Amino acid sequence: MSKSIEQFPKDLSSPLIQIKSSVEKNSKLHIKELFALEPERFHNYSVKFDQLFFDYSKQRVTKNILEQLVALAKNKQLTQWINRLFSQDKINCTEQREAMHWALRLPSEYSKFPELTKQVHTQLQRMYTLVEKIHAGQYRGATGEVIQDVVNIGVGGSDLGPHMVTHALADFKVKTAKPLNVHFVSTMDGSQLSDLLHQLRPETTLFIISSKSFGTIDTLSNAQTVRQWLEKALGKHDRVVKSHFIGVSTKAEKMTEWGIIPDNQLLLWEWVGGRYSLWSCIGFPIALTIGIDGFQQLLAGAHAVDEHFQNTSFERNIPVLMALLGIWNNNFLNIQTHAVLPYDGRLKYFAAYLQQLEMESNGKSVQRDGQKVELDTCPIVWGEVGPNAQHAFYQLLHQGTQAVSCDFMAPIQRYNADHFTYVENAEALIEQHHLALSNCLAQSRLLAFGNEALDAAELKNLPIYKQYEGNQPSSTLLLKELNPYSLGMLIALYEHKVFVQSVIWNINPFDQWGVEKGKQIADQLLPILNGVQNDLSTLDASTRGLIKILLGKVDG
């Protein structure tokens, strides 16, 4: 249990004090005992909504603890905060901005915010027009050839979200007039770009410069490199930049200054946080892959969760439950690391996406009022595709000394839809899907129940190094199938989970000041490494020593 809870005043009616009392009474209860005490536990601790099923029966909670967690949420005025989120309030207090990513998935006919909805759909329609043109083979490069490769240049929210979704929904790739491939480049060292450019033809390649500020050095350095690559092959003509670059940013003037024509500029707004931006024109690579209908289904799934989040009681509200269970594990059971374990290879990049969403949002130590936080905030979030993880770090989960909470996720159905091109192999592939599902269930069962999950005869003479303690809590999210709609739902669940936890911790989840200063210090060091400046006197001894090695002034 977080020691900071001891700092709270001893008001016996305080939800925190009541929960602390429950910890003292229930901390030694094993998950297997919770199931023994409550035969209907699976039914009582699970929620079905639309295409999602959420099972949290393997969490170390009781009915009484859940009631107290809900009371804590109410005490923190969660309902009022949800209402503020879904308004035009500037709840991003440190930057004096709204946080209206939810507006990006409003249906076009939504009447509550007509002007806002119109703004959003105007930009989406401009994106859809470009998508249709590229898909039809009508968008041509400087030499008149049809574009067949599109490279998204971005970093952080301009890369992680679009990359994750594009990979996850590759089965839903639409047919185009000519084959179209979408690629992603993010690293500032040029390694990804170097490998990729060898595979591409300048005449048929289009680049998306995706940067909210249009000032991110990682992105602009890659953009400048590909510009030189294009101009070397096609000549330094205005039509090269005009035909081979599309920009996505809040800064139209910066895109124009760089050379991107207005027709190729897609806009978003300051109230769209980078890690919440895949629903906007930052999602251009997604729409290029799964088509306009697919992209609209992605938005519709997220909007369905927005409605669920706003209109469902906390006791049956999936993102609220996910958040409160995380609070329970982190702040009361002292479980400060959380693993994300999808049992579907298409969700390969989901854990990396969640790392930014959760840790950049809630990795804070200062409250909204400027005071230090009273509770530990975001746990370490990590993970991997489940079957691969079983051969990497499950040893630690099962028999290590660290307490870890886990989210398992899997689709119920796979390899049975008309759009799959490998129907002739469906029977064997369905068996492989069942193999993945059986492993997903087996691992969550063993983590929860430990030796109880083993055969009694086997356990009788089992040496201690082969035994399992169990009691590692987990939730399981099942999707009817992995499609644009259900993936939109899944992502929005985690967005709102993050928001709920920020309310409990009283922090601002929509800024990222911890990211900014490192970039500024890098800007100060770059002239030294480039030989333009040589004054190292203001630097610490370690940084001075490393710079001298990098410049070849001393041996490493």
UniProtKB/Swiss-Prot annotation:
Catalytic site: E360 (proton donor), H391, K519
GO cellular component: cytosol
Any GO BP annotation: glycolytic process
Keyword Isomerase: yes
MF annotations from Gene Ontology: carbohydrate derivative binding; glucose-6-phosphate isomerase activity; monosaccharide binding
Catalytic activity field: alpha-D-glucose 6-phosphate = beta-D-fructose 6-phosphate
UniProt KW Membrane keyword: no
InterPro entries: G6P_Isomerase, G6P_Isomerase_C, Phosphoglucose_isomerase_CS, SIS_dom_sf, SIS_PGI_1, SIS_PGI_2
Subcellular location per the Swiss-Prot or TrEMBL entry: Cytoplasm
EC number in record: 5.3.1.9
Keywords per UniProt: Cytoplasm, Gluconeogenesis, Glycolysis, Isomerase
The protein's enzyme class: isomerase
Pathway: Carbohydrate biosynthesis; gluconeogenesis; Carbohydrate degradation; glycolysis; D-glyceraldehyde 3-phosphate and glycerone phosphate from D-glucose: step 2/4
Family (UniProt): Belongs to the GPI family.
Role: Catalyzes the reversible isomerization of glucose-6-phosphate to fructose-6-phosphate.
NCBIfam families associated with the record: PRK00179.1
Protein name, as recorded: Glucose-6-phosphate isomerase
Species name: Acinetobacter baumannii (strain AB0057)
Gene this chain is encoded by: pgi
